[in-house]
From Swiss-Prot:
Protein EC: 2.7.1.33
Binding site for substrate: 107-110, 185
Species annotation: Francisella tularensis subsp. holarctica (strain LVS)
Entry-linked InterPro entries: ATPase_NBD, Type_III_PanK
Keywords, ordered alphabetically: ATP-binding, Coenzyme A biosynthesis, Cytoplasm, Kinase, Metal-binding, Nucleotide-binding, Potassium, Transferase
Protein name: Type III pantothenate kinase 1
Residues reported in the UniProt entry to bind ATP: 6-13, 133
Binding site for K(+): 130
Cited CDD domains: ASKHA_NBD_PanK-III
Cofactor(s) needed for function: NH4(+); K(+)
Catalytic activity: (R)-pantothenate + ATP = (R)-4'-phosphopantothenate + ADP + H(+)
Active site: 109 (proton acceptor)
Family to which this protein belongs: Belongs to the type III pantothenate kinase family.
This protein's pathway: Cofactor biosynthesis; coenzyme A biosynthesis; CoA from (R)-pantothenate: step 1/5
Length: 256
């Protein structure tokens, strides 16, 4: 078994691989108090519920965009699973070339997404949209080079901003609206959140494609916690909610 873990702004998201397939996954809120012990006990409980033997774990691979949680997760894996994780940091082999001004600023999550995308669609131009706390857009050229991207507020972040900065607008269930024309305040917020996000993404992707991929249109991949909401739009070529974890598994294979 290979355990792949991503420390995100909202959740610690993990998957247990057997071969190249995720057999089990877990989420732990990264906004709650997280010590090595609380996380370690959570992991042991998860493996016990799934009837998995921690002795069968061959490796743990870790990516993070939340610096202050890295120590706790790392320590939990060492103390409770008996394994020192491979952390996706500079110096780890990825097979990904970077054509950006500050390579060290690129988030580990975006590196892992890009690696997985290249594995799925070698020799193709690719754009990956990750619907997380922030929505990130990554452009990868056909020669396995990350050439840049865009970042915008995620759907939940946009909703929280509305509820916190306005007097009469509250949080709503994030779901695909039945119509762009809302008949209630709730449905109007949902329309604005979903179609506003989709419209922004389409415009950014269109401009990136015109500027960089005019001769070979890119494959469009959606991933992240809110990717499934856009399924019925049939805009993306493929939706893979756990793309990042697959990228971590591939990176482990390159470095073992």
């Amino acid at each position: 078994m290979i355990v792949c873990i991503d420390i995100g702004n909202s959740h610690i998201f993990g998957g247990v691989f057997v071969g190249d397939q995720i057999k089990h996954n877990f989420r732990y809120p990264s906004t709650t108090p997280c010590t090595s012990d609380t996380l370690g006990i959570f992991l042991l409980s998860f493996f016990e519920r799934k009837k998995l033997d921690i002795e069968d774990i061959e490796a743990v691979v870790l990516s993070s965009v939340v610096l202050h949680l890295e120590y706790s997760v790392n320590s939990a894996c060492k103390k409770y699973l008996g394994i020192t994780p491979l952390e996706l940091k500079p110096g780890v082999k990825t097979g990904l070339k970077l054509d950006i001004k500050n390579p060290l600023d690129l988030g580990a999550d975006r590196v892992a997404n890009s690696v997985a995308a290249i594995s799925l669609f070698p020799s193709r131009n690719i754009i990956v949209v990750d619907f997380g706390t922030a929505t990130t857009i990554c452009a990868i050229s056909e020669n396995k080079t990350y050439i840049g991207g865009a970042i915008l507020p995620g759907i939940n972040l946009s909703m929280e901003s509305l509820s916190q900065k306005t007097a009469k607008l509250s949080n709503v269930t994030i779901s695909h609206p039945s119509s762009a024309l809302g008949k209630t305040t709730i449905s109007q917020i949902q329309s604005g959140l979903i179609y506003g996000q989709l419209g922004a993404i389409k415009e950014i992707i269109n401009r990136i494609s015109q500027e960089n991929f005019i001769d070979k249109p890119p494959i469009l991949i959606a991933t992240g916690g809110y990717a499934h909401i856009f399924e019925k739009e049939q805009y993306f070529d493929v939706i893979i909610s756990d793309l990042l974890l697959h990228g971590l598994r591939i990176i482990w294979q390159m470095n073992k």
